[in-house]
Swiss-Prot record:
Organism placement in taxonomy: Eukaryota, Metazoa, Chordata, Craniata, Vertebrata
Primary role: Component of the cytochrome c oxidase, the last enzyme in the mitochondrial electron transport chain which drives oxidative phosphorylation. The respiratory chain contains 3 multisubunit complexes succinate dehydrogenase (complex II, CII), ubiquinol-cytochrome c oxidoreductase (cytochrome b-c1 complex, complex III, CIII) and cytochrome c oxidase (complex IV, CIV), that cooperate to transfer electrons derived from NADH and succinate to molecular oxygen, creating an electrochemical gradient over the inner membrane that drives transmembrane transport and the ATP synthase.
UniProt main location, coarse: mitochondrion
Subcellular location: Mitochondrion inner membrane
Binding site for Mg(2+): E198
Membrane topology, record value: Multi-pass membrane protein
Names of the cofactor(s): Cu cation
Protein name: Cytochrome c oxidase subunit 2
Cellular component annotations (GO), alphabetically ordered: mitochondrial inner membrane; respiratory chain complex IV
GO terms classed as biological process: ATP synthesis coupled electron transport
Length: 231
């Protein structure tokens, strides 16, 4: 969950997000070192009065400033490619959840269970309970089991949307007529918030996403109860 005046990323609850945070810190340190070196060279050039007028070429320096950037790019590219392949790894999922974007709400279908489908609308401000978040609460929370691989199938019925939950490191476009998939897993129980991250019309800001991860046994009881009620 984001907080006022927060400088860093949200706390990770999935292995992918932990890898993304580590890569962010890795890239930021490289940028900091490069910026420090550039500022140091600029300060030297502005403060020194010494010049080397007889130098026509410098093969050693040219070799250094050609090889060094290549090494830096490799140091950034290798962990980035590793995370990219991790996001495309789909082990045998325990559960498949389909999210469909509409103007301006989300609908979910539990594809592994019969007739489990819900529409989720934003909770109006005057219905909020103490401690709930404005523009982030919905009338029905999406319930999922923790410590389980969950495959998300994401699409749209009208215009472009984007299904994004920062704490899980997930952001997948919802495109009409196309199914995109993403894998997510939470290592701890709790509520995790997201929003539509693609401009989709006048009420784009009113498409929150709320995932409630619970223990596996509780999820089985919850799913069984809903199945019995739907009969």
């Amino acid at each position: 969950m984001a907080h006022p005046a927060q400088l860093g990323l949200q706390n990770a609850t999935s292995p992918i997000m932990e890898e993304l945070i580590a890569f962010h810190d890795h890239a930021l340190m490289i940028i900091f070192l490069i910026s420090s070196l550039v500022l140091y060279i600029i300060s030297l050039m502005l403060t020194t009065k010494l010049t080397h007028t007889s130098t026509m070429n410098a093969q050693e320096i040219e070799m250094v400033w050609t090889i060094l950037p290549a090494i830096i790019l490799i140091m950034i590219a290798l962990p980035s490619l590793r995370i990219l392949y991790m996001t495309d790894e789909f082990n045998k999922p325990y559960l498949t959840l389909k999210a469909i974007g509409h103007q301006w709400y989300w609908s979910y279908e539990y594809s592994d269970y019969v007739d489990l489908a819900f529409d989720y609308y934003i909770t109006p401000t005057y219905f909020l309970e103490p401690g709930e978040f404005r523009l982030l609460e919905v009338d029905n929370r999406t319930t999922l089991p923790m410590e389980a691989d969950i495959r998300m199938l994401i699409s749209s019925q009208d215009v472009l949307h984007s299904w994004a939950v920062p704490s899980l490191g997930v952001k997948t476009d919802a495109i009409p007529g196309r199914l995109n998939q993403a894998m997510l897993a939470s290592m701890r129980p709790g509520l995790f918030y997201g929003q539509c991250s693609e401009i989709c019309g006048s009420n784009h800001s009113f498409m929150p996403i709320v995932l409630e991860f619970i223990y596996f046994q509780d999820f089985e009881v919850w799913a069984s109860y809903l199945y019995i009620v739907s009969l």
